[in-house]
Amino acid sequence: MGKSAVLELAEDLISRPSVTPEDAGCQELMIARLKAVGFRVTRLPANGVENFWAERGGAGPRLCFAGHTDVVPSGPLAEWQNDPFQPIIRDGMLYGRGAADMKGSLAAMVVAAERFVALHPAHSGRLAFLITSDEEGIATHGTRHVVDWLREHGETIDWCVVGEPSSEKVLGDVIKNGRRGSLNGRLTVHGIQGHVAYPDKADNPIHRAFRPLADLVDQSWDAGNDFFPPTRLQFSNIHAGTGANNVIPGQLQADFNFRFSTESTPESLQAGVHKILDASAMRYTIDWQLSGPPFFTAPGPLVAATQKALQAVEQRVAQLSTGGGTSDGRFIAQLGGQVVELGPVNATIHKINECVAVADLEHLAQIYMEIMVHLLETANGR
């Protein structure tokens, strides 16, 4: 028995070393397949990043499948059981960098579209793809760039399925129907450098920062809601000092991150931080960077179609979740449509010996096609 179309495409994509922001020819491979079944393709490169928008159909609601061709670095090659860019199958698992995050999903999307078009060549609505090579990196010139282009052209997306590896233990046990926002801050506490033997001639920023930093950690920012856990602040880096044990440092720098719910806004969190720090006696500055606001898709047509697809293929009812890190869904949601994430099991993503179950690839293609059928055909009375 030969390999399935999904497996063959997944292997071809994995074999291309597209370490972020490189694409290594992955998108041209996808574009050729999509053009062959009638998709109109617009390439949207930006600052060394490869992006494309592909669409089929002329009018009606738009269903988009989104994903990224870039992968994280492989890590130490000696620790891999195989070359990370020479995919192999072992014990029913496909191994290679990007197998789960997210070249397996990309292969499933493309094959699902091919099969859908073969069965429904005159389908209602519009079927689209939004693909980038800048998701694992700074994510500035990728999906965000394509979304800006769509907005400039007055285009919207009604429904979007992002192929991120959402599953926890088995395929389709979790659907991500939202993500928390992410806000970064770099706090600099300004002191006066001096000799530790003469503290009255210096101003120690470490001492100044102790209580305010503890107050930030202890602060309750919000209580969350039915769909999001409470907003949390975490410090990731703190640095002060020259390395010498007889020098009071002149400044302290602390990096922190908020993962925040829809109960908070970047503005409310910034105001809360400044209120706590202003109550202290220290001199400070903060540089803020918003990675993305939270987004949430309430149960509706897209969630229902995704659940029905999972029931049809996997006989499974998925848990809806907003947990985990950020994704490109945060940019797509700004166009006003419904967004979910559904993809393979995420147990090995970004790890040595990343892998995906071969059987799950075929099932995922079936699930994606069922979503297409439900939203573009069944829901429209076709």
From Swiss-Prot:
TM annotation in the entry: none
Chain positions recorded as Zn(2+) 2 binding sites: D101, E136, H350
E.C. code: 3.5.1.18
Keyword annotations: Amino-acid biosynthesis, Cobalt, Diaminopimelate biosynthesis, Hydrolase, Lysine biosynthesis, Metal-binding, Zinc
Reaction(s) this enzyme catalyzes, per UniProt: N-succinyl-(2S,6S)-2,6-diaminopimelate + H2O = (2S,6S)-2,6-diaminopimelate + succinate
Note describing how the cofactor binds: Binds 2 Zn(2+) or Co(2+) ions per subunit.
Residues the entry annotates as binding Zn(2+) 1: H68, D101, E164
Known pathway: Amino-acid biosynthesis; L-lysine biosynthesis via DAP pathway; LL-2,6-diaminopimelate from (S)-tetrahydrodipicolinate (succinylase route): step 3/3
GO molecular function annotations of the record: acetylornithine deacetylase activity; cobalt ion binding; succinyl-diaminopimelate desuccinylase activity; zinc ion binding
Active site annotation, chain numbering: D70, E135 (proton acceptor)
GO biological process, one term: lysine biosynthetic process via diaminopimelate
Pfam families: M20_dimer, Peptidase_M20
Listed cofactors: Zn(2+); Co(2+)
Top-level EC class: hydrolase
Family, as annotated: Belongs to the peptidase M20A family. DapE subfamily.
Described purpose of this protein according to its UniProt entry: Catalyzes the hydrolysis of N-succinyl-L,L-diaminopimelic acid (SDAP), forming succinate and LL-2,6-diaminopimelate (DAP), an intermediate involved in the bacterial biosynthesis of lysine and meso-diaminopimelic acid, an essential component of bacterial cell walls.
Subunit note: Homodimer.
Protein name according to UniProt: Succinyl-diaminopimelate desuccinylase
Species this chain originates from: Acidithiobacillus ferrooxidans (strain ATCC 23270 / DSM 14882 / CIP 104768 / NCIMB 8455)
